[in-house]
Amino acid sequence: METKETILAKLNTSTDRLTELVEQDGFYFVRKEITREQYPVIKQFYEYQQQSPSPAIVTIYSVYEKEGHFYINEEWIRGESVEEHLYLQGPFSKDEVIRYAMDLCQGLQWFHKHNMIHRDVTPANVIISEEKKAYLVDPGILREVKKNQTNDTQILGTPGYAAPEQFGFTQSDARTDIYALGVLINQMATGKMPKEALPKDRRLRKIVTKCTQISAEKRYLNCHQIYKQLDAVLPEDTP
């Protein structure tokens, strides 16, 4: 017996491709249309998720082709995006910034462990759940890091969050996501881009500055380093 799907809402998206909230027998998920070019790497991402847990990353339930179009069904996380929070309520508290950034470090470290980079870590692509956890969503421009490739074949990413190497001069790697994470931390703390204002907290300011160095060589090597620095800033009595 075929189960019935109900489309509950068309969701806002940065692309013109289909994104909708679906209910099926009491189960809710998000269906997104992806391109033929995105399909192989997102399929690989899905297979990695089946093999090992991925903290702070939206779960992909299925990746498939139907009538010449490609789709993913992914977890629906109840909450609001960082972008929505900044628009409606302004910057986050320092403790919130640190906790959410630590969540994202764990998620990005998972990507990087599997030789993948997200390449679009922005306020619109981070959801704060009702349980107050941060999740990376929309792995639409995921990329596998390829050995011996000197530059990216396509210029992708959100202006302001895209690291210089994403503009085709050198190959992007884990430090590309680190650059975007630094910009995101700054946005959460101040509501502004780093060139406009930096966090008041000296240690947070130092983290943002190192993450967003123009030269990838001067940034943190990995997200674990950032996680440890953030943990040192977090008050001891914070759960």
Regions found by a protein language model. Name each.
Residues 53-62:
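Conserved HxN/HPN-centered segment at the entrance to the catalytic loop
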Residues 67-81:
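Conserved short submotifs of the Hanks-type protein kinase catalytic core
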Residues 100-101:
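Activation segment signature within eukaryotic-like protein kinase domains
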Residues 112-128:
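Catalytic-loop of the protein kinase fold
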